[in-house]
């Protein structure tokens, strides 16, 4: 990943974080790394943990950037996070998708 891509990604995560806070989420952790992969944002609202994947694209629809393989890695990282922190809370996987100046949150992501 080049510097430009890295900076765009970090900017997208900051925008997503501001959006989440504005909408009543509490940010628990950002950029959680494990050997299974990274979780961009871990937030909580109404007793539910939200594991949030942030995708930013200037050209195509960012929803297509969340692949089956990415979801599988994310699920392993979530299991590790929950076990490491001794958590047994309900959770869901969400996406914050950013294309140019449009930000959209999709809750309960699944890939068939």
From Swiss-Prot:
Record-linked SUPFAM superfamilies: Restriction endonuclease-like (SSF52980)
Listed GO MF terms: nucleic acid binding
Bridged cysteine pairs (disulfide): none
Xref: Gene3D superfamilies: 3.40.1350.10
InterPro entries (UniProt xref): Restrct_endonuc-II-like (IPR011335), tRNA_endonuc-like_dom_sf (IPR011856), UPF0102_YraN-like (IPR003509)
Family assignment from sequence similarity: Belongs to the UPF0102 family.
NCBIfam families: PRK12497.2-4
Protein name per the record: UPF0102 protein NIS_1551
Lineage of producing organism: Bacteria, Pseudomonadati, Campylobacterota, Epsilonproteobacteria, Nautiliales
């Amino acid at each position: 990943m080049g510097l430009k891509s890295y900076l765009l990604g970090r900017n997208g995560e900051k925008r997503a974080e501001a959006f989440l806070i504005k909408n009543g989420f509490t940010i628990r952790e950002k950029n959680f790394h494990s050997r299974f992969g990274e979780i961009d944002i871990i937030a909580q609202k109404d007793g539910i943990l939200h594991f949030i994947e942030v995708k930013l694209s200037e050209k195509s629809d960012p929803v297509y950037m969340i692949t089956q393989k990415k979801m599988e890695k994310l699920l392993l990282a979530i299991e590790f996070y929950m076990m490491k922190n001794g958590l047994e809370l309900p959770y869901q996987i969400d996406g914050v998708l950013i294309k140019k100046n449009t930000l959209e949150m999709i809750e309960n992501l699944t890939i068939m």
